[in-house]
Amino acid sequence: MFGFGVGIFFFGYFIFEVPSNLILEKVGARRWIARIMISWGVISSAFAFVPSISAVLQSVGLSFFDNARTFYLLRFIFGAAEAGFFPGIILFLTYWFTGHERARWVGVFMAAIPLSAVIGGPLSGLILDAFDGIMGLSGWQWLFVVEGVPAVLLGLWVFSYLTDKPREAAWLAPDERIALQARLDDERKSREAIRHYTLGEALKNPRVLALSVVYFGIVSGNYGLSY
């Protein structure tokens, strides 16, 4: 049951990842990244109350949703909510940094992933032990709540303060906005002159295939150890 619940997350993620990034391009990073963070936090907190949610669903005639199926449903929605966050952040960085600068900031972003695991493990253990029984909730329930609430709050902050693109940055001087946007536009024009490949051509490229196999191995190892 647990393994299926873990795996169904990726179905939601896979289905909605590309549409999510396309929507981000249309509505702007500020709105869409904030939406991802807020919905992620809300659903993460909801895992603490699976039995209660199951009871509500059954009370309105959806008797199919016992605790296990409610857990599966939340995991699928959780994947759909998170879909697009990682590529969305990478896309957002292209709005602000040239290719030469971008590698450094992508590295900083990627470094946060293992750092969160280093900090999150001991912190999770502390929450499980110290919060157990508070307000009638078990430690594992508090773990989901404490995980979800900061994401919601940070999402609200992102919605209020994140700036989509340099031309909209009121905190930059006018000449700084113009200079930065000009550099980015020049790089974009040079990229447009490069031949673009179709999806089929990319999938036939030996380097793409090799990197896909390597990345699949990395992700499989990470999630295998995590779960």
Task: Label each region the model flagged.
Residues M1-I15:
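Extracellular/periplasmic helix-loop-helix junction of adjacent transmembrane segments
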Residues I38-F65:
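C-terminal ends and interior cores of transmembrane alpha-helices
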Residues G200-Y227:
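Extracytoplasmic gate region of multi-pass secondary transporters
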